[in-house]
């Protein structure tokens, strides 16, 4: 009987230590920073406000959607943005792209309305490949159209990308370049445009 107590005592201590370690681990998880998030004052209740649709072109350039984000991961070396839309939701092989940005410093926390082409970063082609610009949603077909903006937290700016804005960088070029570096996290914002 005495021997059994000696054996059980160390075992009970080990169990208590394991439970204590588990508690510490769980507490550490709950203290992690909030999620990496992307938002826009141009979006309300999941829909793009009318004021930000069908922007007027001036020299083939349109005012860009305002964006803001928070909780960029600490290890981020560079940010990139892609805004896109599938004309046919059932066919993701065909995509229209509305905003392409790369080389954004991780200290940046947003882009003001109309300022996407005027920051310390680089911009790719518009939807039609005719200019370095943002393209605003302006569908002429009736129905609901969904758009998505992905904000990439990257380990570094993809070295294959040019260090200047150019129409040579389209959706495919930027997506493929992003795949060559570590993607730390992605913050996404999706919204709809309803046309009659």
Regions found by a protein language model. Give the residues of each.
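Intrinsically disordered, low-complexity segments enriched in polar/charged small residues
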Residues: 9-10, 103
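Bacterial N-terminal signal peptides that target proteins for export
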Residues: 2-9
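Hydrophobic helical h-region of N-terminal Sec-dependent signal peptides
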Residues: 11-15
């Amino acid at each position: 009987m005495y021997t059994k107590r000696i054996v059980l005592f160390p075992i009970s201590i080990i169990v208590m230590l394991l439970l204590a370690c588990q508690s510490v681990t769980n507490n550490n998880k709950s203290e992690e920073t909030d999620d990496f998030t992307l938002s826009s004052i141009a979006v309300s209740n999941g829909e793009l406000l009318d004021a930000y649709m069908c922007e007027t072109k001036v020299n083939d350039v349109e005012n860009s959607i305002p964006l803001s984000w928070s909780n960029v991961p600490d290890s981020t070396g560079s940010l990139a943005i892609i805004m896109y839309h599938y004309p046919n939701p059932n066919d993701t092989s065909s995509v229209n792209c509305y905003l392409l940005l790369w080389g954004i410093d991780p200290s940046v926390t947003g882009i003001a309305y109309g300022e996407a082409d005027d920051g310390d970063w680089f911009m790719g082609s518009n939807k039609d490949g005719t200019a370095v610009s943002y393209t605003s949603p302006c569908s002429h077909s009736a129905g609901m159209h969904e758009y998505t903006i992905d904000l990439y937290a990257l380990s570094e700016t993809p070295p294959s990308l040019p260090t200047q804005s150019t129409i040579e960088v389209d959706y495919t070029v930027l997506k493929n370049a992003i795949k060559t570096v570590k993607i730390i996290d992605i913050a996404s914002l999706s919204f709809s445009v309803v046309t009659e």
